Amino acid sequence: MTMENQSIVQRALAGLIETGDVDALAPFLSDDFVHHRPGATTSTKVEWLAAVRAALVPLAGMQVEIHQVLTDGDHVVMYSRRWLPDAGPEIAVVDIWRIDDGLIAEAWEIIEPVAQVTANLAWWV
């Protein structure tokens, strides 16, 4: 089941990342889908898809480099780096997806500008 859950997330994101097709993402989300992000309100399926559509214009051309996709039971975790060619900072993103009955039921997203990582981890060294 773990690899099946990973495949669900990868197929859901493929159309969005490769072509910007938000409508291709919708069938992979449960009707009760909830999106969580620190410092932001929780979004329903309809609200989140609308936010993704609105973000596509300013984020057109965004490059996404997926570094890790890990699965544990009904959760899939993806670490990626994203950037806009010739604009804005590169960001590191961790997405956590919870799968329920073959659909994405919940998502969490942590975003950090890569340039801030060194400053934020100064205590680590």
Question: Which residues make up each language-model segment?
Answer:
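Short coil/turn motifs at secondary-structure junctions
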Residues: P85-A87, D100-G102, E112-V114
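Low-complexity, intrinsically disordered terminal/linker segments enriched in charged
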Residues: E109-V125
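Short beta-strand segments enriched in hydrophobic/aromatic residues
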Residues: L29, R82-L84, I110-I111
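Short acidic-aromatic low-complexity motifs
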Residues: T2-D31
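A solvent-exposed, acidic/Ser-Thr-rich amphipathic alpha-helical stretch
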Residues: V22-G73
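Short, cysteine-centered beta-strand-loop-beta hairpins and adjacent loop/turn segments enriched
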Residues: V57-P58, L84-E90
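Hydrophobic/aromatic beta-strand elements that line small-molecule binding cavities or substrate pockets
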Residues: V52, V64-L70, R81-W83, A92-R98
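Hydrophobic pocket/interface hotspot
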Residues: V9, A24-L25, F33, W48, ...
